């Protein structure tokens, strides 16, 4: 190569190198969505994380390609919700998604400027997360999973499946004291109407589950209703297994717990609620203001029965009840 050509080549390289920083800075910044879960790891949240990803794909988002998800897992430890929400606010995510009431309150404490979307929060007005469902105000909106008397409905369905049931236990998580109080009051109304006895059982963490079932074994409990709570979703397989081992007919909130082996469920589609979060994320990334974006409540409820579990428990589900079921697992 001649000296002239060598000088031209070096000049070309130098010119190209000089443009690299500008080319890099011109790359579009991917939106970052922080998600504050409640379980300990991604494996425990696999179904619902999959639902969020599916919901995002409905609007053209692919994780790692045109959106980044910053997942955080507090393992049901109240203090961890607060610190992880603060971490997500500190890295300036574009949206902070909070899974359950405790996560939403931690997110609210962490930021007043980053848009917050809560998912599966039973009573956002009562929790003082929003001013009203129609006009949330502030930087928070989202999806509620609450409808009145669902706990009562589960107990009523359980009584139809087990007519001899005279004592029913109710699993509640006292870490969320206001919501657990509402569920307990609903259950008390139901048992009064059915003329049976209620036995509330508190479970604060996964390690409390086995002792809770041992307590139920030592009392005349012949049925179990599980209130809707992130802790019980994350430990659904453990709950289903313990209920079967203790031969305790169990009515739960989520169909995923019935898939894991519980007897029956009644409630909104958890998967559907999590998938719907993709719509909220898309709208807010495109400029919608949380303050004017109404909170969505469930409109459809599913009744699922697991006949395999019924058979293992020696129960015969009435044909009239099976006819009302949205799905029967055989």
Residue ranges and their predicted role:
Residues 1-330:
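Short hydrophobic alpha-helices and adjacent helix-cap/hinge residues
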């Amino acid at each position: 190569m001649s000296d002239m050509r060598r000088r031209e080549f070096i000049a070309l390289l130098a010119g190209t190198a000089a443009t690299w920083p500008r080319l890099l800075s011109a790359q579009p910044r991917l939106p970052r969505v922080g998600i504050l879960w409640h379980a300990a790891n991604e494996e425990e949240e696999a179904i619902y994380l999959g639902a969020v990803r599916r919901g995002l794909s409905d609007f053209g988002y692919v994780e790692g390609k045109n959106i980044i998800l910053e997942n955080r897992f507090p393992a049901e430890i109240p203090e961890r919700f607060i610190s992880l929400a603060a971490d997500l606010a500190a890295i300036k995510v574009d949206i902070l998604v909070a899974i359950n009431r405790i996560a939403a309150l931690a997110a609210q404490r962490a930021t007043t400027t980053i848009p917050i979307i809560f998912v599966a929060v039973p009573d956002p007005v009562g929790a003082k997360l929003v001013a009203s469902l129609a006009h949330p105000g502030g930087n928070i909106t989202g999806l509620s999973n609450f409808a009145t008397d669902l706990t009562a409905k589960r107990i009523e369905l359980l009584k139809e499946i087990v007519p001899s049931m005279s004592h029913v236990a109710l699993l509640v998580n006292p870490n969320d004291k206001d919501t657990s109080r509402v569920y307990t009051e609903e259950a008390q109304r139901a048992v009064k109407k059915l003329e049976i006895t209620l036995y509330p059982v508190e479970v604060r963490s996964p390690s409390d589950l086995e002792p809770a079932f041992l307590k139920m074994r030592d009392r005349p409990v012949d049925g179990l209703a599980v209130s809707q709570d992130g802790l019980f979703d994350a430990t659904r397989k453990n709950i289903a297994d313990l209920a079967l081992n203790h031969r305790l007919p169990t009515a739960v909130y989520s169909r995923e717990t019935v898939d894991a082996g519980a007897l029956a469920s009644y409630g909104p589609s958890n998967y559907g609620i999590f998938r719907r979060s993709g719509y909220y994320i898309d709208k807010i990334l495109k400029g919608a203001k949380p303050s004017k974006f109404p909170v969505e409540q469930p409109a459809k409820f599913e009744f699922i029965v697991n006949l395999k579990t019924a058979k293992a428990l020696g129960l015969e589900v009435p044909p009239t009840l099976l006819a009302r079921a949205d799905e029967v697992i055989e």
